Amino acid sequence: MEYLGVYDENKINLDKKIARGDKLLDNEHILIALVFIENSDGLFLIQKTSVEKGSKYSSTGGHVLYGEDLKGAITRELQEELGLDVLSDELKFMGSMLLGIPFFDVYHLNKDIDVSKLNLQKEEVSEVSFMSKSEINELIDNDLMIKSHGISFRKFFN
């Protein structure tokens, strides 16, 4: 069972944990960390979630576990979902926003990646590809991208 950290409306850690999926109290929040990977051609690595996860497009990211820091969550998710190892100091914090219950903390990673060498976690990711900003905006406009990921992309990268 995964346990998540609980935060107040000011994103202050309440030093409380909750099982993933359990109901939070009013004014309690969890953290989700997202990373947008951009290559030297200005294209972003976008993944398509597995059929079990809705077959939507997204960036890489996930829930921040209890006791885990944000960069640790990003490096863990990159390893789990893509088989990609990165150093936490390669990640640039772009900002945070509250979307309902979760806070989304968004990071940027400049890195040239050979997608053929990625090891995709099939339970989470069906495919990956590099896309331009206009291609990503088209996915968002056509409701093909996970909503929170689309909002994050437009806020920090458009």
Language-model segments: residues:
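Acidic pyrophosphate-coordinating catalytic loop
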Residues: K23-E28, G95-V106
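Acidic, metal-coordinating catalytic segment for phosphate/diphosphate chemistry
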Residues: M1-L34, S40, T49
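Conserved hydrophobic "DFG−1" position in protein kinase catalytic cores
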Residues: V6, I37, I46, H108-L109, ...
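A glycine-rich, hydrophobic loop/mini-helix early in the fold
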Residues: I32-H63
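Polybasic "coupling" helices that flank or enter modular domains
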Residues: D85, K92-G95, V106-N110
